[in-house]
C-alpha cells in the first residue's frame, strides 16, 4: 500500500508542510510507502522530502520529444530541466515514476515511439499514463480527448517493455470510459488509486473536466 500526495506547483504550500505531512503518515502507517507528485523542485528540496520519509516520486516526463514539450508548456519551462529533475530524483534515492498523456495536443505516432523508447532506457519504477482530457479553462479546451483504446494499447506495450513496473489504471481512464479502469488492469495495469480527498475540496484540484 502507498499514500500518494499529489498537487500543483503551489508556492503557498510550503515544503516544510509537505515534510510534516509525510512524517505524520509514516508515524501513523509505518507499513505504507509515501509517494509524492508535486512537480519540479530543486535537488535540495527533493532531498528534504526523501529524508522526511517519502520513498517514491511521480514526475511525468510528459513527452520525450523536446519540440512537442515546447508546444505543451509555457516558455519558462523546458524539456531539459524536466529531464534534470528526473535524474535528480533518482540520484536522491527515490523510486521514480514518469509518464505521459495519450492523445495530447500535437502528439504524433513518432512522439509515442520516442516515449516508449525513453521508458525502456530510463527504467522507471512507476509509469503513469492516461488519456488527455481537455479542461474548459485552459488553452487546450478545444482539442479532442485521447481515446481509451490507444491508452489501453500503450499500457499493454509498457507492461511488455517494463515487466516489473508499477503501472496504474488511472482516474482519467475511468473518466473517459465507464469500464476504463477495468480495461487498464486487464491490459497490464497493476495499481488502482482511489481518491481519498474529501468531496468538498476536490474541485480545487480539477485537472480536467469531470475529474
Which sequence ranges carry the predicted segments?
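Catalytic cores of alpha/beta
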Residues: 42-51, 105-120, 174-187
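Short secondary-structure transition/capping segments
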Residues: 15-18, 47-49, 69-73, 109-112, ...
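Conserved strand-turn element in the central/C-terminal portion of the radical SAM core barrel
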Residues: 10-12, 41, 85-110, 128-146, ...
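Auxiliary Fe-S-binding modules of radical SAM enzymes
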Residues: 120-211
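Conserved, mostly hydrophobic/aromatic
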Residues: 5, 59, 89, 119, ...
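A general structural detector for well-ordered alpha-helical segments in enzyme core domains, enriched
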Residues: 17-25, 45, 81-86, 111-119, ...
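Core AdoMet radical
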Residues: 1-16, 21-86, 95-102, 125-128
Amino acid at each position: 500500500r502507498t499514500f500518494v500526495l499529489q498537487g500543483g506547483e503551489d508556492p503557498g504550500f510550503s515544503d516544510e508542510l509537505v515534510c510534516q505531512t509525510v512524517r505524520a503518515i509514516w508515524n501513523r502507517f509505518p507499513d505504507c510507502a509515501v509517494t509524492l507528485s508535486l512537480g519540479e523542485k530543486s535537488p535540495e528540496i527533493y532531498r528534504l522530502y526523501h529524508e522526511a520519509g517519502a520513498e517514491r516520486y511521480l514526475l511525468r516526463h510528459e513527452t520525450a520529444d523536446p519540440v512537442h514539450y515546447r508546444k505543451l508548456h509555457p516558455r519558462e519551462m523546458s524539456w531539459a530541466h524536466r529531464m534534470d529533475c528526473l535524474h535528480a530524483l533518482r540520484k536522491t534515492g527515490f523510486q521514480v515514476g514518469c509518464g505521459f498523456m495519450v492523445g495530447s495536443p500535437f502528439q504524433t505516432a513518432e512522439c509515442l515511439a520516442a516515449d516508449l523508447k525513453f521508458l525502456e532506457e530510463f527504467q522507471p519504477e512507476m509509469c503513469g499514463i492516461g488519456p488527455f482530457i481537455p479542461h474548459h479553462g485552459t488553452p487546450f479546451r478545444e482539442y479532442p480527448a485521447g481515446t481509451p483504446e490507444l491508452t489501453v494499447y500503450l499500457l499493454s506495450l509498457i507492461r511488455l517493455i517494463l515487466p516489473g513496473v508499477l503501472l496504474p489504471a488511472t482516474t482519467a481512464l475511468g473518466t473517459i470510459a465507464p469500464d476504463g479502469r477495468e480495461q487498464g488492469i486487464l491490459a497490464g495495469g497493476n495499481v488502482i488509486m482511489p481518491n481519498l480527498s474529501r468531496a468538498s475540496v476536490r474541485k480545487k484540484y480539477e485537472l480536467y473536466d469531470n475529474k
